[in-house]
Amino acid sequence: MINNVVLVGRLTRDPELRHTPQNQAVGTFGLAVNRQFKNANGEREADFINCVIWRQQAENLAKFAKKGALIGITGRIQTRNYENQQGQKVYVTEVVADTFQMLESNKTQGQQTSKPQAQNKKPQAPDPFKAPAADPFAGGTEISDDDLPF
């Protein structure tokens, strides 16, 4: 059987890092993933997916990723159930991420540092290679049927 998930989306909140009684790191986070199509109003909708990540990957995610970060994850879908305080059975479906990858630099995420502005900037000479190339076929050439070799 195949149970593989690959998602790209933005974190809906900062990852929450906890540890099990056996001191294993476990992180939980939400991922907003845009749908491929637009709705009747022409707007793109998103799915909000609950995810779990374990061990060193969980620690790294909590350390480096914050709400709004664009990440990619690979993992699997998992279902579980438990009984809540009211005695009702609750069913949960979530993605258990095996790996994640940051898809934007820190600068892109809005953590840009200010760049010093150049004080005496010299005007740049025009780049001869950026000039539009002339179309060699633009004018066309008149050819009579007598000029053709066949």
Curated annotation (Swiss-Prot):
Residues 1-104 form the SSB domain. InterPro entries: NA-bd_OB-fold, Primosome_PriB/ssb, ssDNA-bd. Residues 103-150 are annotated as: Disordered. The keyword DNA damage applies. Residues 103-120 have a biased composition (Polar residues). One of its GO terms (molecular function) is single-stranded DNA binding. Plays an important role in DNA replication, recombination and repair. Binds to ssDNA and to an array of partner proteins to recruit them to their sites of action during DNA metabolism. This is Single-stranded DNA-binding protein 1. It comes from Lactococcus lactis subsp. lactis (strain IL1403) (Streptococcus lactis).
